[in-house]
Amino acid sequence: SELNIIGQDITGYGMDTSVKSQLAGLLRKIINNTPNVGWIRLLYLNPQRVSSELLELIADSPRVCKYIDLPIQHINNRILAAMNRPITKDEIVALIKKIRKTIPGVYLRTSLIVGFPSETEKEFKELVEFVKDVKFDRLGVFIYSREEGTAAYKFKGQISQRIKQERFDQIMLAQREVASEVNAKFLGRTISVLLEEKQDAGFLGRSQGDAPEVDGLVYVNTKQKLQIGKFIQVKITDTLEYDLVGEPKNESC
């Protein structure tokens, strides 16, 4: 089974009574009080409040998914400021390096917004290059939507829907290439998979690197009678655009 700790910003937990996040303490209590839960997954972490204590706890806890969802939205400093995000490109880069150093083999996910008012072609290209360079394991992209009542609604430099769509497509193309490279590393490897659905050819499941509904799947080809909700070891035999294909380890040659 899997327990998801989810919120728009779970690193804000406890900040109504303290000057710093209490998420690490909460996670420690959950680990100690849920011995029958196979995976514990955190969704989502504010880049400004990811502590060393939290990262070390994730790294040291076998049942906590080595999965960090870090919604950065953009990487250009001017756009970040316009979005009212008090963090810089250098700080984001440093945090990503720290996460990957502290949690070896971590799955790193982010979400981005393209077409924010006044985003120039140069600023957008900076974002594309960042996606190519950092190689997020998982990535979601949203097209900026002008919503009445928001601060950005009145911003000058609103971008046409055509350009916003073009930018969305460019980011997705860049990430498809990254995803192909990321998935290729799993060929021949054996990973833990949580079985979720029976299919004609076998089962659908998820790896530790795949959050429910937003990430990829693992197609498990088998004629065995396996139990939904259980974990099995799967040897990866093929890759799809965002998904993996494999078979139970005891069936592999």
Predicted feature locations:
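Conserved, mostly hydrophobic/aromatic
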Residues: I5, L42, L70, S111, ...
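Conserved SAM/AdoMet-binding glycine-rich loop
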Residues: S1-E121
